[in-house]
Amino acid sequence: MNTYIPEGYKSLLGVYDTQKAIGLLKRLFEDQLAAKLNLFRVSAPLFLEEASGLNDNLNGYERPVLFDIPQAGKEAQVVQSLAKWKRMALHRYDFYPGKGLYTDMNAIRRDEDVLDNLHSVYVDQWDWEKIIESSDRNLDYLKSTVMDIVAAVCDTQRTMRAIYPQLQVLPELERQVTFVTAQELEDRYPDLTPKER
């Protein structure tokens, strides 16, 4: 495992306050995001019945963690991705255009290629999905959604900085978003690969 801690790093909060702050940050951000995007919290499954077909295999080679449930006579898989499950949940909960869900997924990805500060076998990830009208499938709606997400992040940071003055030393996030299309990047950097751009 390749973890990296920058030289001279010192935590701004003690261990207890760090855990307390993480919990608060999650609650604040959930509330901000839900309000700005009209989302409702839905609990995500930890595992799914193998036969349901709702567990994504992500990139095609990752193997889910499997186990049997003898009392039910079923095979189950630890969730790897909620992409299919979220769409099923939108239908099951009778969501309508303009309304969506968010969830906190916990997963085990046993075939993770690289283990480091950002990649782990254990995944704790927020996810959201929203039903939109066909007329909303456009660049303006996408940009507006991005701006709402950035506002949720910035509003959360502002509150955290007010509650924990020690965080004032960190740079304040910018609300202004610069949008760049893939075509603009290709025009500007034609000799670079898409990944390098």
Placement of each model-derived feature along the sequence:
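Class II aminoacyl-tRNA synthetase-like tRNA-binding/catalytic domains
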Residues: 2-119, 127-131
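Residues that form generic nucleotide/phosphate-binding pockets
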Residues: 32, 145, 188
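Long, contiguous amphipathic alpha-helices that act as assembly "spine/axial" helices in icosahedral shell
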Residues: 122-162
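Metal-assisted phosphate- and nucleotidyl-transfer catalytic regions
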Residues: 148-197
